[in-house]
Amino acid sequence: MHMNIIVVKNYEEASQKAFEIIKSLVIEKPDANLGLATGSTPIRLYELMCEDHRVNKTSYKDVNTFNLDEYYGLKHDHPQSYYHFMHEHLFKHIDIKKENVHIPIGEGHIEEDCKRYNQLLSNNKRDIQLLGLGSNGHIGFNEPGTSFDTSTHYIALKESTIKDNAALFFNGDLDAVPKSAITMGIHNIMESKHILLIACGKRKAEAVKGMIEGEVTEELPASILQRHPHVTVIIDEEAASLLTK
């Protein structure tokens, strides 16, 4: 197994560590392909990237970004769309070019859009793919039971994911949460050169244990990362609390 597991004290330290890895890539390779994630986990990392850009002038002008997923049925300008999230938390605060930002389209012709995104991904292998981890072990919106062979696809979200997202972003309103999404498939994720996964908090401990110590199974999508040649897992003490090794 090629997992480099880094256990830190808390979320702040996890974000700092992830930031150091991303910054050193961007300095070493100014036209890097970055795979980005949304949700609550990367928010502090993006703040650190914005602060660093402002203070140290680290440039993203030649960087290309590829987001994991987008809710289906939300327009770009919807305040809960991942397009909006990325602009608010990162893109509008750094010098990235608009044409270098790639996010799945959450409306319109599903098949065509998935095909186009797959083409884009196979032409642009990510130097680093950032991932969070769902409490049910999902990566991107690849829910338990998703085939490891999938590329970008439309998916109906599991109830546990809808509940998690309602609590985090929709003031607990289950009805307001989109019930489906377009997501990079597990095959696309596994094509990345380096995978950087961050997981913090007790809620993630069970999924972390399964991902690192469990068997590789489609019932826990993140377990496939055991088969990737270069994975860095950054977890805080709470998320690491069930690990036995």
Named regions from a protein language model:
Residues 1-34:
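N-terminal glycine-/serine-/threonine-rich phosphate-binding loop
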Residues 35-39, 67, 104, 130-133, ...:
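Short beta-strand segments
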Residues 184-187, 191-245:
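ATP/nucleoside-binding phosphotransfer catalytic cores, i.e., glycine-rich phosphate-binding loops
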Residues 48-59, 82, 144-153, 214-216:
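A glycine- and small-aliphatic-rich helix-loop capping segment at beta-alpha/alpha-beta transitions
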Residues 28-54:
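Glycine-rich N-terminal segment of FAD-binding domains in flavoprotein oxidoreductases
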Residues 32, 40-41, 45, 120-147:
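A glycine-rich beta-strand to alpha-helix segment
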Residues 140-186:
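Class I SAM-dependent methyltransferase SAM-binding "motif I" and its flanking Rossmann-like core
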Residues 1-2, 58-129:
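Ligand-binding beta-strand-loop-alpha-helix segment within the catalytic cores
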